[in-house]
Every structure is written in C-alpha cells, then in structure tokens.
C-alpha cells in the first residue's frame, strides 16, 4: 500500500524481505517459498521499490551455515540460495537490484570474500551492463552517490 500511495518515494526491500527459517518457520522453506515468490512479484510491480540482495547468510534464515564444521564455499552458498536470487532478479531486474553483504552479521556464516565471489557466480550470465547495475549503479542511483 505504501509503494502505491507514494510512487515518488524510493523504497528499499532489505534482505529479500526476510524469509525466516527458524522458530515456527524451521524446515518450512519449501512451504514458504511459493508464497514469498507471489508476494515478491506483487511488490515488484511498483517501480519505486528496489531490492537489496543479501542477508540470506544470517542464521535467522535457517540455512544452517553457521552450524557447519567449515564455512560454505561460494558454490555451496549459491546452490542453497540461488532460487531466492533468481526470483528477485527476475521480478525486479538488475535495474532495481543491488548486491549487499550484511556484514558483520553474515560473518557468523560466511567470509566476506566468499560471499562476494558467490555474488559474482550468481551474476555470471548477466551482461556487463547488468553486472554494473548489480554491483554498483543501482546502489549509486538509489543512495544518490556521485563520483
């Protein structure tokens, strides 16, 4: 309702809108994911809403990386979370998405270099222009960062 009522207001969706995976939502990712997709698609219809892509490494999302004997590799990270990134990128496109690290909170689950390497792997099939948007231009536009 807010995005529709204020179309000139830039709204930033943080951490994929927080698809929780602990507490009453533990082990329900397969059940929650379709509803999350539906809600995200509806939200993406508002051109003033942008998505920050990151934060899924947080323990509250239920992927369990923080409980593993070793932190995940970038490939392991991508294999468990790619569907979330693909969904957001499909609905919002690179023009309204930006990668973000959510450090230091993500540090409980993954190292900073491994996380950014995972983002590069997620974006590997995108054009150079789309990668520029995901890794810089969208954030610069939304946060009004100038050279």
Predicted regions and their residues:
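Catalytic pocket-lining loop regions of alpha/beta-barrel enzymes
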Residues: 1-98
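Weak global preference for isoleucine
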Residues: 10-12, 22, 32, 102, ...
């Amino acid at each position: 309702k807010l995005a529709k009522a204020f179309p000139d207001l830039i709204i930033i969706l943080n951490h994929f809108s927080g698809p929780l995976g602990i507490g009453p939502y533990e082990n329900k990712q397969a059940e929650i994911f379709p509803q999350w997709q539906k809600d995200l698609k509806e939200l993406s219809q508002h051109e003033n809403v942008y998505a920050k892509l990151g934060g899924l490494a947080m323990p509250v999302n239920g992927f369990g990386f923080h409980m593993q004997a070793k932190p995940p590799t970038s490939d392991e990270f991508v294999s468990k979370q790619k569907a979330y990134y693909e969904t957001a990128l499909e609905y919002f496109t690179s023009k309204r998405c930006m990668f973000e690290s959510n450090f230091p909170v993500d540090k409980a689950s993954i190292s900073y270099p491994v996380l950014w390497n995972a983002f590069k792997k997620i974006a590997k099939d995108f054009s150079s222009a789309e990668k520029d948007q995901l890794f810089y231009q969208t954030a610069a536009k939304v946060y009004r960062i100038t050279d």
